[in-house]
């Protein structure tokens, strides 16, 4: 909107502003005057400015609601990002091409742009919030190191090429007994959501009784290494109380050794839970 307005030095945003377009204030006097680091506009993380040191880990400010499109695009040296619980929106290609090793999306996220983490070839794990309804197109495309992904029961739709060329994907866990719709490729009766994932080496874990539905669903029908699990076992783990020690569970809520291969539900000593992938 104001890109290239070289004399624009001051910006005041309305509290009702819904979003800021990618690069909207690039090439302005305002941006040139900002110090190096994460540049903020009100509650928006607009972009990263300056040179980033290798192995950088950043924590966005509490109260940040939006990460603008391409805000950290091609920040190769960004190895970690701490996203605050206040965050609601991640823009298109916001973290594409970064060196992130893992990412955990906060629970209030309700909108994620296409290709948000595309090309993050070092990304090993990603945690999606339980209220997410859509995984947008190309969200994790070309994340070659991504070993496992857990798709919440709330997810109903997965955009085209969301997991395109995720060559290292060994385990997909979908908690929805109804297969999420995989976006068709330009109106065709096939999809590229999982194109490049090797079905010979990737296990699909799905709720008990849903094998027939997944086997008949476009996109999901490519997987033949399928295992059913009882989601209620995990719910029991998540609702349990703190025990004062760290305990590992499988997807059926059964206690397992900490070095067992696959997806673990880890209940920490304080009662908090997280999902991890053990190779």
Q: What residues fall within each predicted segment?
A:
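A recurrent domain-boundary module in secreted/ectodomain proteins
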Residues: 216-233
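Residue-level detector of functionally pivotal "anchor" positions at catalytic/ligand-binding pockets or at interdomain
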Residues: 230-252
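Short, conserved loop/helix-junction motifs that constitute active-site signature segments
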Residues: 166, 186-200
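Structural signature of tandem-repeat unit edges
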Residues: 5-19, 28-42, 50-66, 76-89, ...
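Short loop/turn microsegments at loop-to-beta-strand junctions
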Residues: 34-35, 243-246, 262
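Consensus positions within tandem repeat domains that build extended binding/scaffold surfaces
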Residues: 1-3, 22-26, 69-71, 91-94, ...
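C-terminal tail/sorting-segment detector
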Residues: 263-279
